[in-house]
Amino acid sequence: MNLLEQKEYRPNVAVIIVNLSGKVLWCQRKQHDGWQFPQGGIDKGETPVEAALRETKEEVGLDEHDIEIVYESQQWFRYKVPKEKRTGYFTKKIFFGQKQKWFLARLLSDENKIDLNAYRPIEFDKWVWANYWHPINAVVSFKKETYRQALLSILPEYNKLTKKL
């Protein structure tokens, strides 16, 4: 990947939150059929960890007291957003895709703390606890390969975490 392509991927984070049963938090996008993990862009001057904590708080209402980040991917996982799906940054042709750092987090608090209405704009309508591999088949098609690669990469850390639960 050349330097120009790297700059055309929006820096982003994705957070896999695991409950005491080893299930992962899976969220439905507001007014869309699409489901995904909490995710979002990295703001200027922000570290990926800071972005992961901020996005988790904004999207699902959980703060640093509610989750413990146990793993950060070393690599960036990339995906292109299809032209017909591009909005916001993507319609302005600043970015044609996203590069993501992936995080694995353990839920410390009760699931009652999950609040999809915590911040505006609201990102998700609904959430469920899902099996670890469920997202690969349920995410929008253009993210499937990225999810597969990220989940395979994180699997050893997920297995370590769930053995402790």
Say what each PLM segment does.
Residues 23-24:
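Entry beta-strands of beta-propeller and related beta-repeat scaffolds
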